[in-house]
Regions:
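N-terminal Rossmann NAD(P)H-binding glycine-rich loop of SDR-like oxidoreductase domains
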Residues: 1-23
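NAD(P)H-binding glycine-rich loop region in Rossmannoid oxidoreductase-like domains
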Residues: 49-88, 96-99, 116
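Conserved Rossmann-fold NAD(P)-dependent oxidoreductase catalytic core, especially the SDR/UDP-sugar
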Residues: 92-136
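Catalytic helix-loop patch of NAD(P)-dependent Rossmann-fold dehydrogenases
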Residues: 119-166, 187
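Substrate-positioning beta->alpha
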Residues: 143-144, 171-177, 190-213, 220-221
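Conserved C-terminal active-site "lid" loop/helix of NAD(P)H-dependent oxidoreductases
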Residues: 202, 261-270, 274-304
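Mid/C-terminal beta-alpha module of Rossmann-like enzyme folds, strongest
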Residues: 211, 215-278, 312, 316-319
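Amphipathic terminal alpha-helices
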Residues: 294-302, 306-328
C-alpha cells in the first residue's frame, strides 16, 4: 500500500515516515524543504514530492492513502498565512485525493479546539466549541475540519486525529521552551503546577495515524490521541529535569493576572499589526494554568490504539539525547 504524507519534513512527519516504512508501506513524502526530503529518501527509501500545498492539487500520483500532517502550527501570526496553510491547503489536499481516487484521507487536527478558561477533564471528541476564536490557529483548524467533514459526506472517506502535546527527539516547541526557561528565568508555574495535562510521545501519534489508515471503522469519525497518562504538570517537570540532571527552577505566578496581561499584549500586537509572537499569549496561559485531559476510549476501541511508549520512557529518551548532544 502506498501512502502520501504531507508535511513529511516536519517534526511529526519524520516519525510518521519511519512508522509507515517499518511496517511495509510504500511512502511518498511531501514537503518544501528539499534537504530534509533528501534525508528521508536516503534514510527510509521513500519517494519525495518537493512542492507546497498550493501546488499539490494538480499532482497526479497513484497512492492509496493520504495522511495530511502539514499545517501552520503556532499561536501567533497573520490571518492570511494561517488561512492559506490550514484551510486552503487542506482543500488542496482534498482535491488531490479526489483527482487520484484515494481510498482514505487521514487528517491531523488539534485538541487546541478544546481550550477554555477552566479545568476540563476526560474530554470526548464532540465536546468542543465550534466557534472557538482564541487564536487564528484554532479558528483555521476548525475550518479545516469542516472541509474534511464535507469531503467525507461527498464520498471521500476521511478520519480526523487530534493528538495532544507531541514531544520527542526533534521537538522544537514544548520541551525546548521548558528547558530554556528553566535555565534562564525559571519555568512559569501557575496554580502551583497542580493542573493535570496530557502529553504524547510522538512515536505514539505516528502509530495512531498508521492505525487510522488500516482501520475498517466507519469514515467521518474524529479521535483523540494521547499517552493515556494524565499527569500533574509539576510532576512532568520534576521527572524531566531529574532525567536531564538539573534542578528545577520555578517562577510562581497568578493565572488571573497573567491572563489579563496576555490579553492586553495581544490587543497591542493586533492594533499595531505586530506578527512576531508576543512573550505571553492567552493560549499559553490557559495551557499552563488549567487542567485539560482527553478521553481516548474511542481510539482504543475503533483503532485498537494502545501507546507503545510510556511517558517516562519518552522523557528519558529525550533527556538522554539532549545530554548526549550537549556533551558533543
Amino acid at each position: 500500500m502506498h501512502v502520501l504524507v504531507t508535511g513529511a519534513t516536519g517534526f511529526l512527519g519524520k516519525y510518521l515516515v519511519e512508522e509507515l516504512t517499518s511496517n511495509g508501506y510504500e511512502v511518498t513524502a511531501q514537503g518544501r524543504n528539499e534537504k530534509r526530503l533528501n534525508e528521508l529518501r536516503d534514510n527510509y527509501a521513500v519517494h519525495t514530492l518537493a512542492c507546497s500545498l498550493d501546488d499539490i492539487a494538480s499532482k497526479e500520483i497513484s497512492v492509496d492513502y493520504v495522511i495530511h500532517a502539514a499545517a501552520l502550527s503556532t499561536v501567533w501570526g497573520k490571518w492570511e498565512d494561517f488561512y492559506n496553510s490550514n484551510v486552503t491547503g487542506t482543500q488542496n489536499v482534498i482535491d488531490f485525493c479526489r483527482r487520484n481516487k484515494v481510498k482514505k484521507l487521514v487528517h491531523v487536527s488539534t485538541p487546541s479546539v478544546y481550550t477554555e478558561k477552566k479545568d476540563r477533564y476526560d474530554i470526548k471528541e464532540e465536546q468542543f466549541n465550534d466557534k472557538n476564536k482564541l487564536n487564528f490557529y484554532i479558528r483555521t483548524k476548525l475550518m479545516a475540519e469542516e472541509l474534511i467533514h464535507k469531503a467525507n459526506e461527498e464520498g471521500l472517506p476521511c478520519v480526523i486525529i487530534r493528538p495532544r502535546g507531541l514531544f520527542g527527539i526533534g521537538d522544537t516547541s514544548i520541551i525546548p521552551r521548558l528547558v530554556k526557561a528553566n535555565r534562564t528565568i525559571g519555568i512559569p508555574l501557575l496554580n502551583e503546577g497542580r493542573n493535570v495535562v496530557d502529553i504524547t510521545c510522538v512515536e505514539n501519534v505516528a502509530l495512531a495515524l498508521r492505525l487510522a489508515v488500516e482501520s475498517e471503522c466507519d469514515a467521518g469519525k474524529t479521535y483523540n490521541i494521547t499517552n493515556g497518562e494524565p499527569t500533574e504538570f509539576k510532576k512532568i517537570l520534576e521527572e524531566l529535569f531529574v532525567q536531564i540532571g538539573e534542578e528545577t527552577r520555578y517562577k510562581k505566578l497568578p493565572v488571573g493576572l497573567l491572563y489579563f496581561v496576555s490579553s492586553v499584549l495581544e490587543g497591542v500586537y493586533k492594533l499595531f499589526h505586530i506578527y512576531k509572537e508576543p512573550s505571553l499569549t492567552r493560549y499559553t496561559v490557559l495551557t499552563l494554568g488549567y487542567s485539560q485531559t482527553l478521553n481516548i476510549a474511542k481510539a482504543r476501541v475503533d483503532l485498537h490504539y494502545e501507546p507503545k511508549m510510556t511517558l517516562s520512557e519518552g522523557i528519558k529518551k529525550y533527556a538522554d539525547d539532549l545530554k548526549a548532544n550537549e556533551r558533543n
